[in-house]
Amino acid sequence: MIKLTPPMGWNSWNTFGENINEKMIFETADVMAESGLRDKGYEYLVIDDCWSLRERDENGRLVPDPEKFPHGMKAVADYVHSKGLKFGMYSCAGNMTCAGYPGSYEHEFVDAETFASWDVDFLKYDYCYHSPILHGKYLYRQIGRAHV
């Protein structure tokens, strides 16, 4: 499907950097809905880097930082969706994100399943700490296959 306008919305990085939490995201969703931004086409609310723990769980899954997101990402997605917005998250093609959290390299399929279980609508996919042997074309194709 070809969209007439690019995806428009808000991303946590430029405002909060690594200092993000559930309360800030809920408040941002409220402002986007109540200020009219959503009605003007700004429909995506995206949580950028630094939302997870620094280690995956025993099943290789990403784990939201319970201090920042005590109710988990599914609850955050549900709240964002309740405001008529789409929920986006961040990951990276490398083995680490740009800020040093777990990246999706060699975990593309489990990460896609995890994001789907949280009802994520949009993925911002960065390119830090990537394999020097593999190039972006392969890495982006891999995450694309995982999300199909």
Residue ranges and their predicted role:
Residues M1-W13, L45:
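N-terminal hydrophobic targeting/anchoring segments and the immediately downstream early-domain regions
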Residues G9-N14, E58-L62:
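Glycine-/proline-rich flexible loop or hinge segments
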Residues N14-I20, P66:
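Second-shell loop/turn segments in exported
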Residues M24, T28-I133:
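Aromatic-lined carbohydrate-binding/catalytic grooves of carbohydrate-active enzymes
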Residues V76, Q142-I143:
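Aromatic/hydrophobic pocket-lining residues that form π-stacking "cages" and hydrophobic walls in ligand
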Residues I133-Q142:
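A short alpha/beta connector and helix-capping loop motif
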Residues A146-V148:
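Conserved small/polar residues in nucleotide/adenosyl-binding loops
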